[in-house]
């Protein structure tokens, strides 16, 4: 069977079929499997594993671990079941992004819900690959974006607003503009807990630029039924005294939630940063002296938005080292802990009650500049900075732990990217074209870390950067790599169980739903490659288009 594609027949909101809420595919929902589906029993869920991938991070704790029939003994039986094209309306192409798709899909009641980098939302029948509806916003965002589906409502965002759609039809129910100025944007999947939707702005607007003065991250708590604000929390209060130049903060991914409804968020970097060039007269972040709270931090907030604690990994960040990944709530040594990592290429484990650091572990390649911010946080524009005039910085802007972690309850898994950039007192010295070429040549690693000790259990070197995060089911860990491969590893040993090509390059994570694995390939690296959302299924025998590769 050849991989087939199904397309919506019109732009804007198009209802192709009435959406039945009955499960029609093969999953672990308790319904009888449909004809032709393999019938392996669902393995008992590891600690923290969800019954299905119904939330952006798998569950409220963002463990990216789910129960499924997929194991190390049958993962090689995954084959192509269906494909749906990622079709740009021209906005991403005009921005040089070419069919951008970077999100983790969610699967609710047998329907796959997802979003592309033009903020367009799509519903796809899991069992057949049939597109049920689309709602096109044609609103460019920086990604990873995505949706959250709860109680028959799809929560999403455009580059400026949080929105709610009917899960059955795609009809918009409400919209709430959140950005404070046109230097800001939104590029995350909303969080949801107990009737409240959580969305943060970021200091990036693809139509205007990034880290422009006055742009900041603000976390909004919105009434899920109406979109009305309940509270907001400023992630970078006062922009450190110079809002005309400074910027910073923002969330890439949804908050995590504990049983009491407390929120845990990972906050992005301050600006200006070296990657975009220092503003005249203010080298090395001297327009923003001090540690620049609460950037590059894990922050715990109460359900009412009160700050409970924070841990800052990179004070006075110079190099775009966001701590942007959703904090993972799990246990270690019998105690609740928070594990996180980001573009600094450092994993941390914190006491969930107090925020105390339990362990800290650099992963991937580091070039010796992890603490440069401490050398410069009290500098003035005329200070002599004890750094080389030129040096190679690693992790660079697209290095470190760029995408989300996963845990099986005892081991944390991190997809690590090794990519250096040349740096100087004026900023990055590499041209855009050279930098883009270097992304394709970069390598990476999948790293497994013992949560009790903070020690590496295994570390698999990869020929291409795994921007596809980590996802776990039973004893299998999945990721995708930039050059367009889907990988599966043995969770205990790191042995590669599966390596199979996608239809194009990718920076999108996978979703595990029953005996399906859904992966997006939205980065064509040649004119022959096709941007597709691909569903792999145990026992399926379809093929990717002949032009892929």
Regions found by a protein language model. Name each.
Residues 293, 302-303, 320-379:
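Acidic, glycine-rich loop-and-beta core segments that form the ion-binding/anion-interacting portion
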Residues 33-96, 130-137, 171-180, 228-236, ...:
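Aromatic (tryptophan-biased) beta-strands that constitute blades/sheets of beta-rich domains
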């Amino acid at each position: 069977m050849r991989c087939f594609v199904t397309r919506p027949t019109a732009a804007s909101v198009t209802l192709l079929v009435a959406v039945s809420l009955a499960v029609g595919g093969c999953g672990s929902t308790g319904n009888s499997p449909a004809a032709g589906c393999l019938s392996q029993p669902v393995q008992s869920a590891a600690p923290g594993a969800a019954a299905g991938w119904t939330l952006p991070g798998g569950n409220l704790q963002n463990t990216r671990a789910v129960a499924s029939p997929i194991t190390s003994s049958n993962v090689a039986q995954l084959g192509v079941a269906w494909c749906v094209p990622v079709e740009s309306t021209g906005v991403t192409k005009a921005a040089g992004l070419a069919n951008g798709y970077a999100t983790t899909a969610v699967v609710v009641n047998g329907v796959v819900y997802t979003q592309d980098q033009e903020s367009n939302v799509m519903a796809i029948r899991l069992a057949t690959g049939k597109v049920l509806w689309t709602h096109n916003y044609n609103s460019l965002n920086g990604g990873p974006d995505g949706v959250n589906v709860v109680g028959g409502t799809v929560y999403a965002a455009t580059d400026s607003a949080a929105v709610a759609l009917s899960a059955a039809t795609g009809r918009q129910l409400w919209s709430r503009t959140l950005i404070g100025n046109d230097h800001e944007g939104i590029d995350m999947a909303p969080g949801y807990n107990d009737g409240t939707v959580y969305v943060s702005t970021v200091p990036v607007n693809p139509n205007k630029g990034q880290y422009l003065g006055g742009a900041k991250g603000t976390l909004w708590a919105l009434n899920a039924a109406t979109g009305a604000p309940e509270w907001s929390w400023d992630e970078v209060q006062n922009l450190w005294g110079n809002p005309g130049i400074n910027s910073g903060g923002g969330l890439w991914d949804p908050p995590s939630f504990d049983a009491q409804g407390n929120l845990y968020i990972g906050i992005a970097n301050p600006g200006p940063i070296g990657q975009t060039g220092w503003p005249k007269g203010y080298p090395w972040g001297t327009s923003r002296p001090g540690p620049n709270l609460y950037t590059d931090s894990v922050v715990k907030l109460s359900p009412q938005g009160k700050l409970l604690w924070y841990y800052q990994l990179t004070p006075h960040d110079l190099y775009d080292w966001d701590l942007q990944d959703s904090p993972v709530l799990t246990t270690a040594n019998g105690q609740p802990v928070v594990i996180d990592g980001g573009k600094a290429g450092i994993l941390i484990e914190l006491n969930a009650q107090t925020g105390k650091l339990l362990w800290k572990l650099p992963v991937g390649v580091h070039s010796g500049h992890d603490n440069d911010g401490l050398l410069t946080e009290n500098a003035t524009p005329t200070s002599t900075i004890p750094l080389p005039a030129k040096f190679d910085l690693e992790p660079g802007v697209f290095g470190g732990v760029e995408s989300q972690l996963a845990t099986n309850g005892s081991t944390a898994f991190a997809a690590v990217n090794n990519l250096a950039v040349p740096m100087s007192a004026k900023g990055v010295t590499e041209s855009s074209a050279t930098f883009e070429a270097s992304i394709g040549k970069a390598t990476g690693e999948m790293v497994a870390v013992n949560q009790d000790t903070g020690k590496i259990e295994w570390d698999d070197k990869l020929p291409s950067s795994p921007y596809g995060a980590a996802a776990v089911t039973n004893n299998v860990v999945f990721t995708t790599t930039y050059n367009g491969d889907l990988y599966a590893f043995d969770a205990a040993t790191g042995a590669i169980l599966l390596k199979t090509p996608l239809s194009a390059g990718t920076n999108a994570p996978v979703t595990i739903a029953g005996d399906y694995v859904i992966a997006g390939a939205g980065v064509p690296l040649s004119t022959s490659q096709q941007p597709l959302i691909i569903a792999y299924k145990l026992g399926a025998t379809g093929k990717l288009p002949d032009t892929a590769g």
